[in-house]
Amino acid sequence: VPISIQVLSGDKIEDLGITNMESLSNYVPGLMINKGAAQFNIYMRGVGSGTNKGFSQSVTQFIDGMAINRGEQYLAPMLDLERVEVLKGSQGVLFGKNTIGGVINMVSRSPEIGGEADTTWSIESVPEWSTLKLSGAVSIPVSDNFAMRIAATHEESDGWTYNALLDEDGPTTDSTAIRA
């Protein structure tokens, strides 16, 4: 089956500072992701399903083989990834329904078997927006042929604008994600 595919490695994702689906579209030609108030609108090569909450997305995201096809579910951060594969065009033969526009396939990093405990942590701060983001992962060998990996991220932000009427900053963010 002929496929148009672009693959970004986990190291490349970190180097480019890609932290969410919206920033991914800056580096993949033909992919447009717009964040609305409560969901993403995803278009690949101009094909998408728009903002109708009753429809599944025409471009489906897969995380470790599990389909995520509602726009609200795309809000999860890109956490501890080995690679992201972007397959353009209809992918119904390989991935099934709701893939008429294409597929964004995310593969999580696997634990290291037989090695030592491995940790990675990062802290990002944007003082002018009162934003703090902490991310980390640990790979723990349990035996010579079994290991586990735990990854987590937390982000807090007071927002990037000031509402004079309510006398507060916004829109605020407070999110946590954990994968084991």
Predicted regions span which residues?
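Outer-membrane beta-barrel translocator/receptor signature
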Residues: 57-58, 70, 79-82, 93-163, ...
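N-terminal periplasmic "start-of-domain" segments of outer-membrane beta-barrel proteins
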Residues: 1-12, 16, 40-43, 59, ...
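Short, conserved catalytic or interaction motifs in soluble domains
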Residues: 10, 30, 89, 109, ...
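A general structural signal for stabilizing positions within well-ordered secondary structure
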Residues: 15, 22-25, 75, 94, ...
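Short beta-strands and strand-coil junctions in structured, solvent-facing domains, enriched
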Residues: 14-15, 32-33, 49-52, 68-70, ...
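Extracytoplasmic beta-strand/coil segments of soluble accessory domains associated
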Residues: 22-66
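Short acidic/polar hinge/loop motifs at secondary-structure boundaries
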Residues: 64-90
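Non-catalytic regulatory/gating segments with a bias toward low-complexity or hydrophobic composition
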Residues: 5, 13, 24-25, 84-89, ...
